[in-house]
Each structure stands twice: as structure tokens, then as C-alpha cells.
Amino acid sequence: MNRLHVLATGPLVTVQDRGRPGLAHLGVARAGALDAPAAALANRLVGNAPDAAVLEVVLGGLEVRAEAGCWVAVTGAGRAYAGAEWLPAGASLRIGIPATGVCGYLAIAGGIAVPPVLGSRSTDTLAWIGPARVEPGAVLPVGKPNGRPRALDTPRPPRPGPLRVHVGPRADWFADDALERLCATPYVVAADSNRIGLRLDGPALVRRREGELPSEGMVLGAVQVPPSGVPIVFLADHPPTGGYPVLAVVDEADLWQCAQLRPGEEVRFTRSPRGAR
């Protein structure tokens, strides 16, 4: 079995796959790659199954060395195109700081073969379910390759425009024009955003009802509004329950964009056409 030696890391490197959907009733978040299409592309390039585990690399800084020769692919932040590359035995690969975006993905033929927890190899950074964050000195097992690499593949082109949202279950807790104000107002990504949620800076949304809800189930992409009135978009490691009202839900097809937004960048929302999901 091949192994990957971690020589250096940046701000955050974790193992991710498609996550743990369907376990919210047990109090387990979905987790998984923040930019799911980029992770799937990396796997496709090296011949892996779509649910193989990859390394999610926040703002670069990762350097690894493979014990045996292997096919690798890097996608996501700062990558206009991608292709599989052969990494010789003993050679190292370094992912630098991207010029744009946040989350990059490193796939290796055979996938990262850490033991699965609750059906997934993903790290949940809120509950710390799954493997520990990847640190220098870590040695990661690699599975047996079972597919053909692809020399070149074209990532999806960035979809220009705002994040599409659906009306949330607690829209009636807000002023009649709250959703329109959300969609008409530019927000800015806050510095404390992470895998749990995209935190925003901008004007507060006005509520018509006082008090708080009993905790209820939350979904990926929920636009939750805390007492400050400034919305938060729940991402992969969001808590399964929450007590603040949800005004809207971001269309899942657009959530990958949240993985590539840097602090200080502008975010806009728009009402999703009916049936966009």
C-alpha cells in the first residue's frame, strides 16, 4: 500500500469525501468537501470513485511526499483547468497559496484510505468526528488504484451572479420585505467564516417577532439570522439543530461558491426560480 507523508500544511488541511448525509436525526452533521464539484473533479481525473476521500487544503501551504509513484490531481482554488499528473516515488508535491479562492483539493489515485467513521472519511470540524486535522508529520494510507487517470479535464466555469435562495421555513418571523432586502443588499464575507458557516458583514434584517425558537433541525445552506440581524449561511460542518430563525436556504447547486469566497469579498443573493432544486 502506498502512503503519503505530510511535510507541511497551511491554515487547515482535512480529509474530506461526500460526507455523512442522512444522519442529522442522530445529531451528526453532513460534513464533506465544501466545494463538492471541485473534489469530484479531482477524483475523476485520477480515476477514483466520486466518493473517494481527498485532502481539502485551505489557502495552500500543503507539501506531501509519496512513497510509491502515483497519479495525483489538484483542483479548486486558483485553478482555471486541471489534469492528472504522475508523482514519482519519493517525489514531493507542494500546493502554493492560490491567487484566488480558498479551498483546493488534492486527489491521489486510490483515495486517502483512513478508517471511515459513520460511513465517511470526512473530518467534521465542529464535532470532530472522523480523522484529526492533517498536520506536518502525518502519514496517510492510500488505497489501491482502480481506475484510469485522465490527462485533462475542464472544471465547471464559474457561474457569475449571486447565490440563489429559496424561501426559508421561518420567513414569517421577519418583516414583509426582509427577503427582498436580503436579495437587494450586498454583504461582505467576514474574517471568522469557516467550514461551519459563511459569516457576513452588512445591514441587519428586521424581525417582526421577538423571542427565540426552540431548537429545530437545520439544513445545509440555511440562512440563519441571529439576534444581530446579520445572516449566516450554514456550510458543511453546521450544527444539526439551531434556535435562530431561518429566513432562506441557499440552493445547493450554488454552495460551492461559498467555499471560494475570501474575507472582504462581496456576496449577493437572489430569489431562486421555482424548481431550481
Predicted feature residues:
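Conserved "landmark" site that anchors the functional core of diverse proteins
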Residues: 1-277
